[in-house]
């Protein structure tokens, strides 16, 4: 099943990649995360990535409370948490839009698998 990546996720992933190119981001960023962000920015996403997104956002939501991740006047802005959030397709304000989108896709994927298993 092809998954259409919304513009806001494409744009956020690209913004995260731009920050990364400018030297921002933490040491914990994996090559897999960077590769997936490049794919999302280009409008492509794997089922595996979508399935990882909703739980990842749930685990990292609190990162948005750190000053370096939410206050553009903070000397540490943009913090590693913000850069990672963007690379995963999330909005800079740490809202639930990308998490909600990912959960809808997961639900759709699960429903499709259920339909196929009945046939």
Q: Where in this protein do the model-derived segments appear?
A:
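Conserved small-residue motifs centered on glycine
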Residues: 1-115
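Conserved small/polar residues in nucleotide/adenosyl-binding loops
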Residues: 118-119
């Amino acid at each position: 099943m092809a998954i259409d990546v919304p513009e806001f996720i494409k744009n956020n992933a690209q913004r995260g990649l731009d920050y990364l190119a400018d030297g921002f981001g933490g040491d914990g960023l994996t090559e897999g995360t960077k590769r997936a962000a490049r794919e999302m920015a280009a409008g492509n996403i794997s089922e595996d990535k979508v399935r990882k997104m909703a739980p990842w956002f749930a685990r990292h939501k609190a990162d948005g409370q750190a000053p370096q991740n939410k206050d553009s006047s903070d000397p540490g802005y943009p913090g590693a948490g913000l850069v990672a959030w963007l690379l995963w397709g999330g909005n800079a304000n740490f809202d639930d839009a990308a998490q909600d989108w990912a959960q809808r896709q997961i639900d759709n994927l699960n429903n499709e698998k259920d339909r196929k298993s009945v046939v």
